[in-house]
């Protein structure tokens, strides 16, 4: 049985010339939720769960072929990189699907310029730098809380995430980030704590209501 291509994994057409980083990222997110629907239901609030239920309407059947998270992540990191995608497309054109499988399984044997390995860590494994410290240090992304991790290419802050990055991918509970200096990617997993804002708002509303009733009694 031939191995699926990265395009098949993300349900993208290799002949589409107008694939953008945004459309590839959207396909990646869609693939994760399609093949691993638990990604959107295990960690998040009811509002996110509602959006997930809308993306999987009643009567929806799971895919016949289920891809692993590693397959989906590797497909995304390869196709979202112009250099790697060009090399991958060349491999698809010049060989059979079995050769594209070789591309997938032997990528670690290629030179460093073609490395697409993906390490998986928890957010707690990254160094947290509050925005106040970042601002005083003059870091470019200085107005946001930032998480850093060194890359094995030598860059001490090769991987960088902001709170905005985490919020953007909150429905997945993970985010893929590429090293600033090489093609190595990192998958960072995290759990989104349930927001207590609604409860606080309810308490405030109840408090306002009690105050209103008390004011009426005084009158």
UniProtKB/Swiss-Prot annotation:
Per UniProt, where does Zn(2+) bind?
151, 153, 179, 182
Q: Which GO CC annotations does the UniProt entry carry?
A: cytoplasm; nucleus
- Protein's GO biological process: protein histidyl modification to diphthamide
Keywords attached to this entry: Cytoplasm, Iron, Metal-binding, Nucleus, Zinc
The pathway is: Protein modification; peptidyl-diphthamide biosynthesis
Q: Where is the composition biased (Low complexity)?
A: 40-54
Pfam families registered for this protein in UniProt: DnaJ, Zn_ribbon_CSL
Start and end of every J domain? 5-92
Functionally, this protein is described as follows: Required for the first step of diphthamide biosynthesis, the transfer of 3-amino-3-carboxypropyl from S-adenosyl-L-methionine to a histidine residue. Diphthamide is a post-translational modification of histidine which occurs in elongation factor 2.
Q: Cite the domain annotation text.
A: The DPH-type metal-binding (MB) domain can bind either zinc or iron ions.
Q: What is this protein called?
A: Diphthamide biosynthesis protein 4
Native organism: Neurospora crassa (strain ATCC 24698 / 74-OR23-1A / CBS 708.71 / DSM 1257 / FGSC 987)
């Amino acid at each position: 049985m031939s191995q699926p291509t990265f395009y098949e994994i993300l349900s993208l057409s290799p002949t589409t010339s107008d694939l953008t980083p945004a459309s590839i990222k959207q396909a990646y997110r869609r693939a994760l939720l399609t093949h691993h629907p638990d990604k959107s239901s295990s960690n998040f609030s009811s509002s996110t769960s509602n959006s997930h239920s809308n993306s999987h309407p009643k009567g929806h059947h799971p895919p016949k072929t289920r891809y692993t998270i590693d397959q989906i992540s590797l497909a995304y990191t390869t196709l979202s990189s112009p250099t790697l995608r060009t090399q991958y497309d060349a491999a698809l054109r010049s060989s059979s699907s079995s050769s594209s499988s070789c591309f997938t399984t032997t990528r670690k044997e290629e030179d460093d310029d073609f490395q697409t390995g993906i390490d998986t860590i928890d957010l707690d494994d990254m160094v947290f730098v509050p925005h106040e410290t970042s601002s005083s240090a003059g870091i470019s992304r200085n107005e946001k809380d930032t998480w850093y991790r060194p890359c094995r290419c030598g860059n001490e802050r090769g991987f960088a995430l902001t709170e905005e990055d985490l919020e953007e991918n909150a429905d997945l509970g993970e985010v893929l980030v590429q090293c600033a200096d090489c093609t190595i990617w990192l998958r960072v997993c995290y759990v989104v704590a349930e927001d207590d804002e609604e409860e606080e708002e309810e308490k405030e509303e109840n408090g306002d209501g009690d105050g209103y009733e008390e004011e009426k009694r005084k009158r």
